[in-house]
Amino acid sequence: MLTRSSGVLMHITSLPNAFGIGSFGQSAYDFVDFLVETKQTYWQILPLTTTSYGDSPYQSFSAVAGNTHLIDFDLLTQMGLLKESDYASVNFGDDPTSVDYERIFFARRPILETAVKNFLANQSLQDDFNHFEKNNRLWLDDFAEFMAIKEHFGNQALQKWDDKKAVARDPSALEKYRILLAEQIQYFKVTQYFFFKQWTELKNYANQKGIQIIGDMPIYVAADSVEVWTKPELFQLDKERNPLFVAGVPADQFSATGQLWGNPLYAWEEHKKQGYA
């Protein structure tokens, strides 16, 4: 039987930070210490997946990849990958009560590119990265390729990419983009390494202090996602990977007209054939 316990719901993005959005940095560790001091047991957070248009963690480009907005620059500086001057004068937004997602989307990219460049130039760090790549190959390669190709087409949704062979994952098209976008693909891999390194270290710290993390995950994946791109047979889609039906909920106390989420419905018979793997 569980003992009676309490906790706090506080998503990472809501932590105080100088970078326009909460991160896995010192304020997160301070919050863990606060939970310990106030005799809490649980820290509840929202999904940590990468966000798409609308900046909702429930509409993600991937069911697995992490949100790189949460990568802390000070921690990268401690690794020798950045200098404070790389980000100290950057305007990440000046409203302490709200995140300017569009601003940080563009402001963070060149800083992360600098960190990735310095990381790849440091041979002493590559063994751990290679280990990360090997352990996450089931999703990491596809995600990095998806994001790089998506960026190549102006960040358009999967279904609107100009090259329909890329949408359909034609082998010759994929090989072409792997060569053309090799640098960008590597960028998306390394930033995922940064994310999971920082998140794992924070979670381990919390657990060692007796704080348990209550996570969350979306019910569905987004139509514009790597899963729809790589596993279309698992969803109810047309030949262009557009959803035939979309998820939502009927009217309730939160919405008099109901909600239409736009996520593709699962093809449950195909999931059953694959053992729900």
What is the predicted role of each segment?
Residues 188, 192-221:
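Conserved, well-ordered alpha-helix/loop/beta-strand core segments that scaffold catalytic motifs
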Residues 26-51:
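Catalytic domains of carbohydrate-active enzymes, especially glycoside hydrolases
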Residues 1-2, 11, 17, 55-196, ...:
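Alpha-amylase-like alpha-glycosidases and glucanotransferases acting on alpha-linked glucans and related
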Residues 44-54, 217-223:
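Short, solvent-exposed turn/loop segments enriched in Gly/Ser/Thr/Pro and often Arg
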Residues 6-10, 43-44, 213-215:
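Hydrophobic faces of well-ordered beta-strands that scaffold small-molecule active sites
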Residues 7, 11-30:
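N-terminal catalytic cores of NTP/NDP-binding nucleotidyl/phosphoryl-transfer enzymes
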Residues 29-37, 202-208, 277:
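Short amphipathic alpha-helices and their capping/turn segments at secondary-structure boundaries
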Residues 35, 45, 146, 206, ...:
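Conserved, mostly hydrophobic/aromatic
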